Amino acid sequence: MPLKMAVYPGSFDPVTYGHLDIIDRGLKIFDGVIVAVARNSEKNALFSVQERIELLTEILKDRPEARVETFDGLLVDYVRRVGASVIIRGLRAVSDFEFEFQLAQMNRNITRDVETLFMMTSVPYSYLSSSIVKEVSCLNGPVDKLVPPLVKSALDAKFRG
């Protein structure tokens, strides 16, 4: 029986505990999860694509069923190319749903071979976003409960040299 793979795409700028929650829950459903760092979301990025890949790879090193890759272009093309059939998307609030629903419908319009699975974030992460993390860290606020220690160190290096 072939492995059932899913793709969890995002900018991950930076990766948060909310992202890791979705990855871990995805790994309970699928044989493997490809964490796909989007190359075409560079505008206003704090971390380069390479830095994000390195952070994610180190953080996920104890999760062999998760692998980190990068992609550009249409997500559904990438998903088909890597042999996956499901896109995982995390939803924090109802406000996320409308945009994500539109993307899922467009992807479905492009191909019927790829499904989108929406996962509600766990309650502790329902407000969490990479943008909030960057804002709080930039202002020297505490982000210890929002991101792994490696990411906190990387944020400190960016904002405080």
Swiss-Prot record:
For this chain's UniProt record, which GO biological process terms are given?
coenzyme A biosynthetic process
- Keywords assigned by UniProt? ATP-binding, Coenzyme A biosynthesis, Cytoplasm, Magnesium, Nucleotide-binding, Nucleotidyltransferase, Transferase
Recorded hits in Pfam families, A to Z, give: CTP_transf_like
Residues given in the record as substrate binding sites: 11, 43, 75, 89
Which GO CC terms are listed, alphabetically?
Answer: cytoplasm
Q: Write down the required cofactor(s).
A: Mg(2+)
Which positions does UniProt annotate for ATP binding? 11-12, 19, 90-92, 100, 125-131
The record's InterPro entries line, in alphabetical order, gives:
Cyt_trans-like (IPR004821), PPAT (IPR001980), Rossmann-like_a/b/a_fold (IPR014729)
Q: Does the keyword ATP-binding apply?
A: yes
**GO terms of molecular function:** ATP binding; pantetheine-phosphate adenylyltransferase activity
Site positions for Transition state stabilizer, renumbered to this chain? 19
Localization, UniProt: Cytoplasm
What is the top EC class of this enzyme, as a single word? transferase
Question: EC number(s) per UniProt?
Answer: 2.7.7.3
Q: Describe the subunit structure.
A: Homohexamer.
The cross-references to HAMAP family, in alphabetical order and at most eight, read:
PPAT_bact
Q: What does this protein do?
A: Reversibly transfers an adenylyl group from ATP to 4'-phosphopantetheine, yielding dephospho-CoA (dPCoA) and pyrophosphate.
Task: Give the protein name, as stated in the record.
Answer: Phosphopantetheine adenylyltransferase
